[in-house]
């Protein structure tokens, strides 16, 4: 029977229970998360990423000094191209 490979996703979502054994040594028991836990973890992670992107975007926007309509247009187009390039690579 093939053993499931651990991926960064499963490693980050595994729940580790530490228990003391009879000899006083600690044992670790790994539990695989169920689909509800995975979805909850995914949604929380994506929400944090979206908030970070929005904050970074606003900070950049506010850092522009005396923006003209043309400079804003160039800035927005550059950000759009970069965003689309990242979307295609992911």
From Swiss-Prot:
The keyword Membrane applies. InterPro entries: Flu_proapoptotic_PB1-F2. Residues 1-20 have a biased composition (Polar residues). GO terms for biological process: symbiont-mediated perturbation of host apoptosis; symbiont-mediated suppression of host cytoplasmic pattern recognition receptor signaling pathway via inhibition of MAVS activity. Residues 65-87 are annotated as: Mitochondrial targeting sequence. Keywords: Apoptosis, Host cytoplasm, Host membrane, Host mitochondrion, Host mitochondrion inner membrane, Host nucleus, Host-virus interaction, Inhibition of host innate immune response by virus, Inhibition of host MAVS by virus, Inhibition of host RLR pathway by virus, Membrane, Modulation of host cell apoptosis by virus, Viral immunoevasion. Is not encoded in all strains, and seems to be dispensable for replication. This is Protein PB1-F2. It comes from Influenza A virus (strain A/Duck/Czechoslovakia/1956 H4N6). The lineage of its organism: Viruses, Riboviria, Orthornavirae, Negarnaviricota, Polyploviricotina. The gene is PB1.
């Amino acid at each position: 029977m093939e053993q499931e490979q651990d991926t960064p996703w499963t490693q980050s979502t595994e729940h580790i229970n530490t228990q003391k054994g009879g000899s006083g040594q600690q044992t670790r028991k790994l539990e695989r998360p169920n689909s509800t836990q995975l979805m909850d973890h995914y949604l929380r992670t994506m929400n944090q990423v979206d908030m970070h992107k929005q904050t970074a975007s606003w900070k950049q926007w506010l850092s522009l000094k005396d923006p003209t309509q043309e400079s804003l247009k160039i800035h927005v187009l550059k950000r759009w191209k970069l965003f689309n390039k990242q979307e295609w690579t992911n």
